[in-house]
UniProtKB/Swiss-Prot annotation:
Family, similarity comment: Belongs to the ZCCHC12 family.
PANTHER family (alphabetical): PARANEOPLASTIC ANTIGEN, ZINC FINGER CCHC DOMAIN-CONTAINING PROTEIN 12
Region (Disordered): 1-20, 383-402
PROSITE patterns: ZF_CCHC (PS50158)
GO cellular component: nuclear speck; nucleus; PML body
InterPro entries reported in the protein's UniProt record: PNMA, PNMA_C, Znf_CCHC
Keyword set, alphabetical order: Metal-binding, Transcription, Transcription regulation, Zinc, Zinc-finger
Tissue: In embryonic brains expression is restricted to the ventral region of the forebrain, including the septum, amygdala, caudal putamen, and in the basal-forebrain cholinergic neurons. In adults, expressed in the brain, and at low levels in the testis.
Protein's job: Transcriptional coactivator in the bone morphogenetic protein (BMP)-signaling pathway. It positively modulates BMP signaling by interacting with SMAD1 and associating with CBP in the transcription complex. It contributes to the BMP-induced enhancement of cholinergic-neuron-specific gene expression.
Protein name: Zinc finger CCHC domain-containing protein 12
Organism (species): Mus musculus (Mouse)
Zinc finger (CCHC-type): 346-363
Amino acid sequence: MASILSRLGSSRGQNSPLPPWAHSMLRSLGRSLGPLMASMAERNMRLFSGRAEPAQGEETFENWLSQVTGVLPDWHMPEEEKVRRLMRTLRGPAREVMRLLQAANPGLDVEDFLRAMKLVFGESESSVTAHSKFVNTVQEHGEKPSLYVIRLEVQLQNAIQAGVFAEREANQARLHQLLVGAEMSTDLRFRLKNLLRVYANEPERLPNFLELIRMIREEEEWEETFINPKRPRRAESVMERALSPMAFQSSPPIMISSIDCNVIEIDDSPDDSDEDVILVEPEDPPLPSSSASSFLGRAVSEDQVLVIESPNIFEIQAPSTSSGAGRKNNRGFGELRRARKRKHTIHCSHCGEEGHSKETCDNESDKGQVFENLIITLQELTHAEERARGAPGEPIGLSEPQ
């Protein structure tokens, strides 16, 4: 349109510009004729097949790439439409290779499309380099065999253009490298090895690129349908279960404030074992399970907290009392029993201190004071008895210690 405007302007003279309506009409005409001109340019593009000897109406890769580079700036359309138009200019092996590459990469744009074309059909490398790349192309970890074959085909075409293999040897070289560099099922590997052995002297009867892709895809679909869904999960070994932290996880400790409950000790009899019993009886009504977080988060001092570790506090039975009679615990969460060592405060009758019993008291420094207090107490009791005898109506009492 710019060339048309310049020609019209020059024909009318430099001092006679076009009226505004002419510019508007030409712009509308350009928008209408643009797709038609692009379609005509596409129809005039020569074809490319990738064969060693181009057929009638086909171009070499260099000529095809040159005309594509010249027409791309006039294609004002999305990338997908550009790739679709480029595919229309391909025939034969070139079309099949790029179709498979596009299927493996749905988001293929024009830049990647041309880069792949240059890699497969561009200038040939040296025969040593091309052969080395081909034989060193192996399947990557996690890569499907079908995608590996596409990658292998790129290196095979480069090797053919470099003169490493003849056209009739392509099927044999492709199949041999596939067996070397790919991981596949035992059945498919056996079938391909058998084909390679049977048609060793007739390589043209071996499966070509498209037939090989079809065989591999059928095998992959069969494995995904019948084998992968039935594959059992790996059984967890006994050692893994033993080392699991969940195997040693017990019930969380229950913190009970001494303000909310009474701790009752049941004295041991000579027949009892070394395990004592603690009865915890609440003064408040049981808390619902929804308030467990606030119950556990209550701020109390350390000497007012009793920690009881119990796997199931609702199924513990009450121990037998001093009379030997036992009863089941039917009070639910309120009554907790645990056969462990004493957790309550013990008062020593020997030295008057807390934290130990008379049998384990070793406070030698206070023994004299204890005896002195005992003598004073006995004297007061004697005096009180004498006063009671002297004055029968007077009440008996103990004088306050001085």
